[in-house]
């Protein structure tokens, strides 16, 4: 990706984009699956983009990674001991689960170059892959879920948007396969896009999960570098989810966020009804 006057821009539509002033472009490669760009920005530190969309920045990655791990962590009947991450090649979700005390984490990433870029530029996140509690597999997550005999307390779909290699991660067939590898009381969570700019993504995740799981809920959070800053996650279980008391906090997550993130604006409620 070429810079225009030292700015990287993520285009949301033909009429709108979010731009970051950058001091340098550190990397631009085309893998077998996607294009990866790495920029050094003035306000947000290093920025990782895949196919032109922001995946994480040094300054605000903690928000996304806390939301996709710490919220579902508190929805299982007891603290989960093991987890499966599909995607998440930067290591941020695995790093957070280690901090939460999980004993066994399987992280399945389809593109080894995402892992290599993270090891080079985001060592605080990718250090998770050196931890004895984490098993990193470079393979197709959809095929892994279909073929594995392991079962999990928590399944995290930490993917790009529902297109290209990630499209199948939002399908009913995939959710059916995840249902088969869930321990009793387990939950599954997926990022589901911006309700404002990507309503199809949240509808796709919610409707797909509703066909498979009896309890499906949406929660949201504020992530400054994602489209609109307003981001959604969809969490589900074959069992009724009853939040456990929250006695911990992160930089973003706390007991108030655990409760408030499920309080949805009316237009979001209407998207999923």
UniProtKB/Swiss-Prot annotation:
Record-annotated active site: 158
Residues holding spermidine: 65, 90, 158-161
Catalytic activity, reaction form: S-adenosyl 3-(methylsulfanyl)propylamine + putrescine = S-methyl-5'-thioadenosine + spermidine + H(+)
Primary localisation category: cytoplasm
Classification via InterPro entries: PABS, SAM-dependent_MTases_sf, Spermi_synthase, Spermidine_synt_N, Spermidine_synt_N_sf
PROSITE patterns: PABS_2
Family matches, as Pfam families: Spermine_synt_N, Spermine_synth
Subcellular location(s) of the protein: Cytoplasm
Keywords carried by this UniProt record: Cytoplasm, Polyamine biosynthesis, Spermidine biosynthesis, Transferase
GO annotation, cellular component aspect: cytoplasm
GO MF: spermidine synthase activity
Domain of life: Archaea
Positions annotated to bind S-methyl-5'-thioadenosine: 34, 109, 140-141, 165
Pathway: Amine and polyamine biosynthesis; spermidine biosynthesis; spermidine from putrescine: step 1/1
UniProt cross-references to PANTHER family, sorted A to Z: SPERMIDINE SYNTHASE (PTHR11558:SF11), SPERMIDINE/SPERMINE SYNTHASE (PTHR11558)
Subunit-structure text: Homodimer or homotetramer.
Family: Belongs to the spermidine/spermine synthase family.
Function statement: Catalyzes the irreversible transfer of a propylamine group from the amino donor S-adenosylmethioninamine (decarboxy-AdoMet) to putrescine (1,4-diaminobutane) to yield spermidine.
Name of the protein in its database record: Polyamine aminopropyltransferase
Species annotation: Thermoplasma acidophilum (strain ATCC 25905 / DSM 1728 / JCM 9062 / NBRC 15155 / AMRC-C165)
């Amino acid at each position: 990706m070429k810079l225009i006057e030292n700015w990287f821009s993520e285009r949301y539509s033909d009429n709108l984009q979010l731009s970051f002033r950058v001091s340098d472009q550190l990397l631009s490669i085309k893998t077998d699956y996607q294009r990866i760009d790495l920029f050094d920005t003035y306000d947000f530190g290093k920025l990782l983009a895949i196919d032109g969309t922001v995946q994480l920045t040094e300054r605000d990655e903690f928000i996304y990674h806390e939301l996709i791990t710490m919220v579902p962590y508190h929805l299982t009947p007891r603290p989960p001991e093991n987890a499966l991450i599909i995607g998440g090649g930067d290591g941020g979700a695995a790093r957070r689960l280690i901090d939460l005390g999980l004993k066994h984490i399987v992280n399945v990433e389809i593109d080894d170059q995402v892992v290599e870029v993270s090891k080079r530029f985001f060592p605080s996140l990718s250090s998770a892959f050196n931890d004895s509690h984490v098993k990193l597999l470079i393979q197709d997550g959809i095929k892994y879920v279909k073929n594995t005999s392991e079962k999990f307390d928590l399944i995290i779909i930490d993917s790009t948007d529902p297109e290209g290699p990630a499209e199948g991660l939002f399908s009913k067939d995939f959710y059916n396969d995840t249902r088969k590898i869930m321990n009793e009381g387990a939950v599954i969570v997926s990022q589901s896009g911006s309700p404002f700019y990507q309503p199809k993504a949240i509808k796709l995740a919610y409707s797909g999960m509703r066909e498979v799981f009896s309890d499906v809920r949406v929660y949201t959070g504020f992530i400054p570098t994602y489209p609109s800053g307003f981001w959604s996650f969809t969490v589900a279980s074959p069992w009724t989810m009853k939040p456990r008391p929250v006695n911990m906090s992160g930089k973003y997550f706390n007991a108030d966020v655990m409760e408030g993130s499920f309080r949805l604006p009316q237009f979001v409620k209407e998207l999923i009804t």
